[in-house]
Amino acid sequence: MKNQIHNYDFLIVGAGLVGSLLALSLIKKKFKVKIIEKHHQILKDQRTLAINANSKDFLNQIGIWNKIKTQPEVINRIIIQDHLDNNQKLVFENREEPMGHVAYNYEIQEIVRSKLLKLKCMIGGINLNQDNIKANEIIVLNKSRYLFKKIIFATGKNANFSKGFSKKTFPTKHKSYVGFFSHSKNHQNIAYEIFTKNGPLAVLPAPSKKKNYSTFIFSTLEPYSIPEQLKILEKNFQGSHGAIKLKKKIFEFSLNPHLTKTKLENIILLGDSLRSMHPVAGQGWNLGIKDIQTLCDLTDLYDFRSNYFDEIYYAKRQLESVAYLGMTSMINYVYDHPNFFNHFIIRTSFKALQKFKPLRNLFIKQAMGRGYTFV
């Protein structure tokens, strides 16, 4: 029928990995879901994901983990180090289970999108004005008319909202460089975060049977050429990783830390649309998974159509979002503004984590996604 209206529970705008995983999770709970994306094909993102223990459990529960083509690389230990006080160092590990894994973003996205296409719930090539997408009002998708009870935006950190949204930004002049390098020594399944004089440099073991391949994220105030990035990697990792050969393809990203709110009814923000942070924490994607888990858990407890459902969701995600944004902003500030007071804060923080076991255990659990549940 030409004027038929299709009634659905959820419309998810944005078929990136977080939005797609939410769609799959809600469908498994028997909700009627459509997910729309402006692109027809997956953008082949060659980057990796740092997947903490909680996110790995989630991917396992929805039937994704064991289907990943390239076996994810294990993270057994995390080393945090800085250039102050003779390269003071923190070492974190958990003997009960891996602290995390590293997998290729694109491989997980392919699995999820294949499932969604088979379920006929995804529509590509749709580019609607986000301000005109409203719940309980007719939305036309490919000439068909739909009504959705709830709208979920998972359109990423650069989403442009205007009416009914407030966006708190945390300005930073940092830009991030992401790339890969091969090395002559075994990486020993160790992840590193080194606070260099030039900015935070993270190196993670990348999926590879020979264990001689790693990925890096370097965030800095100044532009760096490929030879300059190689020089920084060699300075900090030649001892642990041996001879380093940098891959030519380097990705460059501007950073846009923010926390966005809305009081519009039946509108949910998810993942980087809700909050985006500096990659120094390495937890942005994992927080998106927690958004999914929180929302799905709430559908078991409350009517998702009720006025208070959105308020409860935002209340549960607000504290963790603010905590991570505040922490990453503070870390960047004290390193970007070297002085006696900021050096004192850094030294004190390192010593506290070195000496107090309960604090170390809390840090480990939080990094693994097994920490305090924010309510």
Where are these regions (language model features)?
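Beta1/beta-strand and adjacent pyrophosphate-binding region of the FAD-binding site
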Residues: K2-G16
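Conserved N-terminal helical subregion
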Residues: I5, D57-Q61, P72-K163, F170-V178
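Glycine-rich FAD pyrophosphate-binding loop
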Residues: V13, S25-R47
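N-terminal Rossmann-fold NAD(P) dinucleotide-binding loop
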Residues: G19-S20
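Conserved N-terminal glycine-rich FAD pyrophosphate-binding loop of Rossmann-like flavoproteins
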Residues: H40-N60
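Conserved FAD-binding catalytic core of PHBH/FMO-like flavoproteins
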Residues: S144-R145, K150-I250
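FAD/FMN-dependent oxidoreductases across multiple families
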Residues: Y224-N307
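C-terminal helical "tail/cap" subdomain of flavin- and related membrane-associated enzymes
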Residues: D297-V375
